[in-house]
């Protein structure tokens, strides 16, 4: 598939997601980085978003809870180029009932080439990268070209 470029602006649209056993870790991380996150547009799956907004005072656009379709909503936003990066603290030792949705979300994030952090260390690296505060060009699938090929 051909690619084209997309600009992630200096004001990022960031998805915050955590499995139940990781919500406290994501809350602690978010509190630690509250000032760095303030200028950005924050999205989260339902329960996580409500906890983060209540405990940090940050403005968070909460979607549905992950098992109720929130993971799929985030995937749709990524495919529509409305999410620039994702912080997803997940529990690798526990199977989630909505594991297929989680796998699909990670696949879409990979297809659309957005930066993804899956634990505190990788989230710290993303947030402290010099690229975080800049406009950044990334390669993404050329969907228009893909569609033309399929319809030819």
From Swiss-Prot:
All residue ranges annotated as the MGS-like domain in the record: 6-152
GO terms assigned for molecular function: methylglyoxal synthase activity
Keywords assigned by UniProt, alphabetized: Lyase
EC number: 4.2.3.3
Domain of life: Bacteria
Gene3D superfamilies referenced in this protein's UniProt entry, alphabetically: Methylglyoxal synthase-like domain (3.40.50.1380)
One cellular component term from this protein's GO annotations in UniProt: cytosol
Binding site for substrate: 19, 23, 45-48, 65-66, 98
Enzymatic class: lyase
Transmembrane segments: none
Any matching Pfam family: MGS
NCBIfam families in alphabetical order: MGSA (TIGR00160), PRK05234.1 (NF003559)
Similarity comment: family membership: Belongs to the methylglyoxal synthase family.
UniProt function note: Catalyzes the formation of methylglyoxal from dihydroxyacetone phosphate.
Protein name: Methylglyoxal synthase
Originating organism: Haemophilus influenzae (strain ATCC 51907 / DSM 11121 / KW20 / Rd)
Gene behind the chain: mgsA
